[in-house]
Amino acid sequence: MKVTVIEEPLLEFGKGTHICPRNGIERMGVYDTKDELRRSELRLGIVGRGEGVDKLDVWLDLCRSGIVGKESELSNLFKGFGGVSADYGFFTRLLSSPGFTRALQKSSIVKVSRIKTREERVVAAVNLYYEQVQFLAENRAIDVIICVIPEELFLSLTQKDAGSKKDTGSVEQYMEHDF
């Protein structure tokens, strides 16, 4: 058997190249900082229930402020994260506002969660969020829209239908969510 080792390519960043994405962003900024039309703000639209939106706001604050790295002999493994700010790394500000947020009613979530078949629940949930996403896209100057899915709705969308013999898997198989 013949084995060929391919050298890992250098990644391009705003002010140079580096092999590591984290180090490259930290030291040289993201690639599009070279773009003269690049915006310095990222406006976030949010669709979800109150509690989930509040948790997302806390998480976004953590993203803005940064995360301290862990002590380790492997210095590159548990590096800190400097945060998302206009002065560092991503060179942008994350902007969220109540005016960019669309709240879903609990009664609407419960109604979708009680639909008998999973397929119909998924379609109803997509339609529920789509109305609010469409409003934000058409009426606000938004760059990214984040859909916050309440746990009750998430569980109803990831569980098998009542009476179905096919199991869709456990919640643990899905990405961790806490919004």
Predicted regions and their residues:
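Long, low-complexity, intrinsically disordered terminal regions
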Residues: 1-179
